[in-house]
């Protein structure tokens, strides 16, 4: 099998690398299953050192094929999802990566950092590559933690992260908000408030759960900014501040416009700036659909967030998808996101 694959790597501007195994023979699920079986040691080594590996040229074409491939890598797949991104279930263990509109950027994040037991492994496959854009960039969050200005990192370490979420409910009542991506019944897959409360209690991270008028739910949770990698002990930037902060969208769109020069991104950046300014005037932090502060309620300094985004983008590897690609990620080391795109795109995800 080794003579039918080429091994290479993609590189970030800061020198981070992601390993790539490209098949030269006929594609197909049997070839991918054989590769995983024969190269399990290589795959585990790449995950332990570089944190991710891309398997290219195997021609995955359906969610069912991807589930079989993901199960070959990690037999114990999971399917409970308490995240904020809209996703559709395609098989019992495969979901659409996100149902957000194509113009909407998804900032870098390790999956479900705000839960007690985040996934250990994350796997994506590209079944239909976008005509332009739509990359799923990867960032080594160990390198981000090490590269942060010590003063900025210290403020995050001392201050921690406090996530504020205000959800509408199954009645659909309440104000419209572009920052509210799901209702609470969609996240928890129930309309029973007692079940929601039990699921939140099981996580052990929520300091406030409050039901409000109009069928609304407020959740506040507290988290550390960094986490020690469970195998190496390395410090990892492991939180959602760069995703959930009110300024996340304009911060991402400005950098995307600088990268692509697309007028769509420029227009969306300016719109997001104006929308965020209006939201700040109209509602306190506690009432925002999605926002985060430090643990004591103090706002995170804008300059600290901008520095964090700069470091993340410097370590970003953003290679275009090809049809049939599959990437395996150590979720405790490597983050992912999504760049805007044009044309049809289908990227699917599984985790363990």
Question: For each predicted feature, which ranges?
Answer:
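A gly/proline- and charged-residue-enriched helix-loop-helix capping module
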Residues: 78-110
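Beta-strand elements within well-structured catalytic alpha/beta cores of enzymes
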Residues: 47, 53-56, 326-329
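Membrane helical hairpin/interfacial module
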Residues: 50-52, 56-81
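Beta-hairpin (beta-strand-turn-beta-strand) motif
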Residues: 58-60, 111-113, 126-129
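Active-site environment of non-heme Fe oxygenases that use a 2-His-1-carboxylate facial triad
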Residues: 1-34, 103-106, 117-318, 323-329, ...
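Active-site-flanking structural segment that lines cofactor/substrate pockets
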Residues: 28-46
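Polymerase palm active-site segment centered on the conserved acidic dipeptide of motif C
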Residues: 76-87, 207-211, 317
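Membrane-interface amphipathic segments in extracytoplasmic regions
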Residues: 41, 64, 87-88
């Amino acid at each position: 099998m080794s003579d039918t694959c080429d091994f290479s790597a993609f590189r970030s501007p800061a020198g981070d690398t992601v390993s790539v195994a490209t098949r030269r023979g006929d594609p197909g699920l049997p070839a991918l299953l054989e590769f995983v079986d024969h190269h399990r040691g290589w795959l585990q080594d790449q995950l332990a050192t570089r944190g991710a590996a891309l398997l290219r040229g195997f021609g995955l074409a359906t969610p069912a094929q991807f589930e079989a491939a993901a199960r070959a890598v990690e037999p114990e797949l999971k399917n409970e999802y308490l995240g904020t991104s809209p996703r559709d279930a395609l098989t019992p263990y495969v979901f659409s990566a996100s149902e957000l509109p194509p113009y909407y950027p998804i900032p870098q994040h390790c999956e479900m950092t705000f839960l007690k037991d985040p996934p250990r492994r994350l796997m994506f496959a590209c079944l239909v590559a976008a005509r332009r854009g739509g990359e799923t960039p990867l960032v080594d969050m160990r390198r981000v933690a090490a590269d942060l200005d010590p003063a900025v990192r210290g403020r995050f370490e001392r201050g921690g992260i406090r996530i504020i979420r205000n959800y509408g409910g199954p009645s659909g009542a309440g104000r419209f908000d572009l920052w509210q991506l799901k209702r609470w019944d969609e996240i928890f897959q129930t309309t029973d408030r007692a079940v929601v409360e039990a699921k939140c209690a099981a996580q052990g991270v929520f300091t406030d759960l409050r039901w409000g008028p109009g069928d609304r739910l407020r959740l506040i949770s507290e988290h550390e900014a960094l986490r020690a990698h469970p195998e190496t002990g390395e410090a990892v930037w492991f939180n959602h501040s760069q995703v959930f902060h009110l300024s996340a969208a304009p911060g991402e769109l400005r950098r995307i416009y600088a990268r692509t020069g697309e007028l769509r991104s420029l227009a969306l950046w300016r719109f997001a700036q104006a929308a965020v300014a209006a939201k700040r005037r109209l509602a306190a932090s506690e009432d925002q659909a999605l926002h985060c502060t430090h643990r004591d309620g103090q706002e995170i300094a804008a300059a600290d967030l901008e520095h964090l985004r700069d470091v993340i983008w410097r370590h970003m590897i953003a290679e275009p998808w090809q049809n049939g690609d599959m990437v395996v990620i150590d979720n405790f080391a490597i983050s992912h996101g999504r760049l805007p795109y044009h044309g049809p795109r289908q990227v699917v995800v599984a985790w363990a």
